From Swiss-Prot:
Residues 1-155 form the Reticulon domain. GO terms for cellular component: endoplasmic reticulum membrane. Keywords: Endoplasmic reticulum, Membrane, Transmembrane, Transmembrane helix. InterPro entries: Reticulon, RTNLB22/23. Coiled coil: none annotated. The chain crosses the membrane at residues 30-50, 117-137. The keyword Transmembrane helix applies. It is a multi-pass membrane protein. It is found in: Endoplasmic reticulum membrane. This is Reticulon-like protein B23. It holds the Pfam family Reticulon.
C-alpha cells in the first residue's frame, strides 16, 4: 500500500473515531468496546455460517501471531518517542536552554487556551487531518517528480 493509501485509510479511520467520540459524546473506551463487540459478533456469525455450509476455514485465527522482533520493534519505537518527549521537557524544565523553555511554554499555553475553546477530540482530529494532508501532498509531489524523470508530460 502506498503512502497515499495509508493517508486515506488513516483519514477514514480517524473520521470514524471522531464521529464516535465527538458527535455521539462517547468515550474511547466505549469505542474499543463497540469494535470488539462487532468483531466478536461477526466472527461468531461467520463461524456458524461456515459450519452450516460445511466450509473449512483455511487459517485458524488463534494461530495468528506476531514475531518477537516485531513486538520488540513496536515497544522500542514507543519507548524512543516517550523518551524523546521526556528529554525535551526535562531540558526545558531545567532552564538550561532558554529558547526551548520559551517554545515549550508558548506551545503549552496555546494548547491550554485551545483546549478551553475546542474539545480535545476535535483538536486531535484536526491534527490527524493536517497530518494526512501533508502525507498526500508529499506523495503527489513525489509522483510528479518521478513522472518528470520518466519523461512523461503532465497536463
Amino acid at each position: 500500500m502506498g503512502e497515499m493509501g495509508k493517508a486515506i485509510g488513516l483519514l477514514i479511520s480517524g473520521t470514524l473515531v471522531y464521529h464516535h467520540c465527538a458527535n455521539r459524546n462517547a468515550t474511547l473506551l466505549s469505542l474499543i468496546s463497540d469494535v470488539l463487540i462487532v468483531l466478536l459478533s461477526s466472527l461468531a456469525i461467520l463461524g456458524l455460517l461456515f459450519r452450516h455450509l460445511n466450509v473449512s476455514v483455511p487459517v485458524d485465527p488463534l494461530e495468528w501471531q506476531i514475531s518477537q522482533d516485531t513486538a520488540c520493534n513496536i515497544v522500542a519505537r514507543l519507548a524512543n518517542t516517550v523518551g524523546a518527549a521526556e528529554s525535551v521537557l526535562r531540558v526545558a524544565a531545567t532552564g538550561h536552554d532558554k529558547r526551548l523553555f520559551v517554545k515549550v511554554v508558548i506551545c503549552l499555553y496555546f494548547l491550554a487556551a485551545l483546549g478551553r475553546i475546542i474539545s480535545g477530540v476535535t483538536i486531535a482530529y484536526a491534527g490527524l487531518c493536517l497530518f494526512c494532508l501533508s502525507m498526500l501532498f508529499r506523495s503527489s509531489i513525489r509522483n510528479s517528480v518521478l513522472n518528470r524523470r520518466n519523461g512523461e508530460i503532465l497536463d
